[in-house]
């Protein structure tokens, strides 16, 4: 590892330990030339797939886009920022676990809707209305009827 002070390429590891969250290894190093100490962090590289859009374009997976969409759907609902982050983290983890190089937006959208449905039904309907691009009120009503059927027709 190159010393940030003198540029020498050789060092020794003085101390090595996991970070609190277990997501990285912190290493204290000492340069063999100038003997100054510096810290490095080693972490697993997140390898997220390319997202294949409906029109066939490909772009890098962007967590921020999912956060924005979910947060918009959850506006003025009793859903905390922590719950939004947890939902998006779960979707991101699911995408990583698939191990695919490419993933369709439909897979991501369905994963988000599945989790939103259990988190907040109003947010789910809001997200679904944008994601599924309902063409008219009839399609919207069909989605609501399906939601009511799956909930056993309970009134809230």
UniProtKB/Swiss-Prot annotation:
ATP-cone domain residues: 49-139
GO molecular function list: ATP binding; DNA binding; zinc ion binding
Manner of cofactor binding, per the entry note: Binds 1 zinc ion.
Taxonomic superkingdom: Bacteria
Alphabetical UniProt keywords: ATP-binding, DNA-binding, Metal-binding, Nucleotide-binding, Repressor, Transcription, Transcription regulation, Zinc, Zinc-finger
Keyword Signal: no
Zinc finger (unnamed): 3-34
Pfam families in UniProt: ATP-cone, Zn_ribbon_NrdR
Biological-process GO terms, alphabetical: negative regulation of DNA-templated transcription
Positions of transmembrane segments: none
Cofactor(s) the protein requires to work: Zn(2+)
PANTHER family hit by this protein: TRANSCRIPTIONAL REPRESSOR NRDR (PTHR30455:SF2)
Similarity section: Belongs to the NrdR family.
Role: Negatively regulates transcription of bacterial ribonucleotide reductase nrd genes and operons by binding to NrdR-boxes.
Protein name in UniProt: Transcriptional repressor NrdR
